[in-house]
């Protein structure tokens, strides 16, 4: 009896590791994973949080079926949790796990769809700056869509985690106990830095609140690394990631696009571009301060009148659509924030 025909799988296209974090939403995950399948990375790390109850099990199983379609030569690692830990510390745990097995890695959540050139771009950046401790991360998301730079990427101290990459040296430096908060001198320097550069002032409070929970929040750990080490991130001159997060049921953005202020809405609708290779590298490592200032305007950081305008725009959009429960909830949260009752958890 003849042996069954063996079909050779196509080889990996990019020698890079990719970590995908997902939970129970198969539809957006399928779009992200399709981009990964086309890119054919050499190593794949799949991390899924456990169910909160019976209601999650169907979505969890559907997500696992999505990521089982690995039809290229790829080293696959799976870490599927049986108990739900929540976004935090799941993100931190996933990254610690992946970087125990690889030195360089791309991190994608189930709502960040990268362009195809994002993968070789990250590969080249991860190799080129592997030993440069000034560089903390490689970002795929450019919040301004395009940036006027004569090179294919530039440097910033702004942190964007919608499709990014980093090194084991960075993740290993994270302190999940936030012990640096016990150093009065470090805290004074950080407060002065935040005040002098209009960097998100709530992040210091967030780090304090995160420490109080006893959980590791990777966003505040990454932020504190950037600030305390005067680190820089690499940003492509053209945006390379489309984010699907602003939909009902998403973890961080529960509203629809139609009630989001126009400037913020643009971040969820801008295209993901391809870069041409070979890349044009900047001959120096200096922060593009103008980009950071543009991002501050986008997020209304240090721009109170822009923030007021955004709040009024969002209120009007919700009023037009009769979403009075959303308005009431936002008002209650605003009052609680004024009273100091809102915790960053």
What are these regions (language model features)?
Residues 2-108, 112-345:
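Peripheral/terminal regions associated with large enzymatic or DNA-binding modules
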């Amino acid at each position: 009896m003849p042996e069954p025909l063996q079909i050779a799988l196509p080889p990996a296209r990019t020698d890079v590791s990719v970590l995908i974090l997902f939970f129970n939403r198969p539809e957006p995950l399928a779009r992200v994973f399709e981009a990964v399948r086309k890119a054919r990375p050499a190593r794949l790390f799949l991390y899924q949080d456990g169910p909160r109850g019976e209601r999650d099990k169907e979505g969890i199983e559907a997500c696992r079926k999505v990521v089982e379609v690995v039809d290229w030569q790829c080293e696959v690692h799976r870490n599927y949790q049986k108990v739900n830990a929540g976004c935090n510390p799941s993100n931190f745990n996933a990254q610690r796990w992946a970087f125990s097995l690889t030195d360089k890695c791309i991190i994608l959540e189930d709502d960040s769809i990268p362009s195809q050139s994002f993968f070789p771009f990250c590969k080249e950046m991860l190799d080129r700056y592997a030993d440069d401790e000034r560089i903390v991360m490689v970002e795929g998301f450019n919040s301004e869509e395009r940036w006027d730079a004569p090179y294919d990427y530039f440097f910033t101290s702004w942190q964007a985690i919608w499709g990014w990459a980093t090194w084991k040296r960075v993740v290993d430096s994270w302190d999940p106990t936030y012990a640096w908060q016990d150093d009065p001198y470090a805290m004074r320097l950080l407060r002065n830095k935040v005040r002098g550069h209009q960097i998100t002032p709530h992040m210091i409070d967030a780090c304090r609140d995160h420490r109080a929970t006893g959980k590791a929040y990777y966003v505040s750990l990454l932020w504190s690394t950037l600030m305390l080490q005067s680190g820089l991130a690499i940003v492509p001159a053209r945006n390379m990631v489309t984010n699907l997060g602003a939909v009902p049921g998403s973890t961080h953005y529960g509203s629809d696009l139609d009630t989001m202020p126009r400037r913020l809405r643009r971040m969820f609708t801008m295209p993901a571009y391809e870069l041409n290779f070979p890349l044009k590298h900047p001959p120096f490592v200096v922060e593009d301060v103008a980009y950071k200032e543009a991002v501050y305007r986008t997020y209304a950081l240090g721009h109170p009148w822009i923030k007021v305008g955004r709040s009024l725009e969002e209120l009007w959009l919700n009023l037009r659509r009769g979403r009075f429960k959303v308005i009431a909830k936002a008002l209650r949260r605003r009052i609680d924030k004024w009273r100091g009752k809102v915790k960053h958890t």
